[in-house]
Regions:
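N- or domain-start disorder-to-order transition segments that initiate the globular core
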Residues: 25-64
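Polybasic, low-complexity association/targeting segments
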Residues: 11-30
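Active-site-facing alpha/beta catalytic cores
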Residues: 18-22, 102-258, 262-263, 285-286, ...
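Long, contiguous binding/interaction regions
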Residues: 7-13, 49-52
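Conserved, mostly hydrophobic/aromatic
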Residues: 75, 281, 347
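Conserved phosphate/anionic-ligand binding catalytic regions in large, soluble enzymes, centered on
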Residues: 71-84, 343
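Internal helix-turn-beta structural module
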Residues: 321-366
Length: 368
């Protein structure tokens, strides 16, 4: 993998330490590449930009019920190997084309990994898998991969964790998510209000749905907050609000919430809040205990609800890679190609089977 080019800023750091007040726990400061420079080095270009716009509109149409297809956001828990991720994308693109009349496939391409305590923080933060924190290289690798995935014909979905990251990659993204640990965060609600694509808010890790519903309402409003502009300069960003935010059910504290009674409760909560009674269900996380076999079963249960005529379920999320399960990242040990180093995933064969089942469910729903 390529190395970043950020230079260390030493003078400011030493001056800060000498006054005995500032930056006493900062080891070093490294210059971050400005967004505009990275966008010029790795341009979206007209054809790719048109694909992103088209993908966003298709997602919106599904979320708003104008398109009867089911959106399926599917891909690795968190990308650690761009080569394997692109291999996966090419297989997924072929399957997407086969099922495109019934399923809108969005590839999950996650680069930032929220941690409950510590651990690998994702490709952008640690692209070399060695805790070196080479964020400049991580941003380049991430953007390059997004462009390559777009070239396969797939729209892209990302989780947004760091509020600065979107300036580097958001122009490539058709759908975004705010995770369970950050749905309650004002910073992320403000961020979502200014993003140019639909954003899903997950229910909290304890299963609380109201927090995510409140987040959807908050992100629909306009906000002003501190961020950076394309030149990398500090700026105050004024947003118009995002009308395309929605709820994602992901279970909580080991208890799933994808079964019909929990889905109905969530729809009632949305209705009381004055929001459209439509939602996305994450078949992984606490809806499966991060167990690939249970995730596959959860996907089947969700497909059955769709087949039975439930039009409120407009999307599903799956954690999927080439090889089932997960592996530990151990220094000096070779990694299994195509297997997750974060949450356990279903393998490619089960992924293809799940997509086919979702497509059949949509056909049944249309006829119900």
């Amino acid at each position: 993998m390529e190395k970043g080019d950020g230079k260390m800023i030493i003078g400011m750091q030493e001056g800060a330490k000498r006054d005995g007040v500032r930056d006493q726990r900062i080891a070093k400061v490294v210059e971050l590449v400005p967004p505009q420079r990275l966008l010029e080095e790795l341009p979206l270009a007209a054809e790719r930009a048109q694909a992103v716009v088209r993908g966003r509109q298709e997602v919106v149409d599904v979320l708003q019920g104008r398109d009867s297809r089911l959106m399926v956001v599917v891909g690795p828990c968190s990308v650690h190997d761009p080569v394997a991720a692109l291999d996966y994308a090419r297989r997924l693109s072929a399957k997407s084309e086969e099922l495109h009349e019934d399923v809108l496939v969005v590839m999950r391409v996650y680069f930032e990994k929220p941690r409950t305590t510590t651990g690998w923080k994702g490709l952008i933060n640690d692209p070399h898998l060695d805790e070196s924190g080479d964020v400049n290289a991580g941003l380049r690798i991430a953007r390059k991969l997004l462009l390559e995935v777009l070239d396969t014909g797939l729209p892209v979905g990302c989780e947004f964790l760091d509020p600065i990251t979107p300036q580097y990659i958001a122009d490539c993204v058709a759908w975004g998510a705010i995770g369970a640990r950050t749905s309650e965060s004002q910073t992320h609600r403000q961020l979502a209000s200014g993003l140019s694509m639909p954003i899903g808010f997950k229910n909290r890790t304890d299963g609380n749905i109201q927090v995510a519903v409140d987040a959807v309402r908050a992100a629909a409003a306009s906000h002003a907050f501190a961020g950076i502009d394309d030149a990398g300069m500090p700026a105050i960003l004024h947003t118009t609000g995002n009308p395309d935010c929605h709820l994602i059910l992901r279970g909580g504290h080991g208890v799933p919430n994808y079964h019909p009674p929990e889905v109905e409760d969530a729809l009632v909560t949305l209705g009381v809040a004055g929001l459209p009674e439509r939602l996305v269900i994450d078949a992984s996380h606490d809806n499966s205990g991060k167990d690939p076999e249970k995730q596959f079963l959860a996907a089947g249960d969700i497909a059955d609800q769709v087949a039975d005529g439930n039009k409120a379920i407009v999307g599903v999320m799956l954690e999927s890679f080439l090889v089932e399960g997960r592996q530990n990242l151990v220094p000096g040990e070779e990694l299994t190609y195509g297997q997750s180093i974060t949450d356990a995933c279903i393998d490619w064969e089960d992924t293809a089977s799940a997509l086919e089942r979702f497509a059949a469910a949509v056909e049944a729903r249309r006829g119900s």
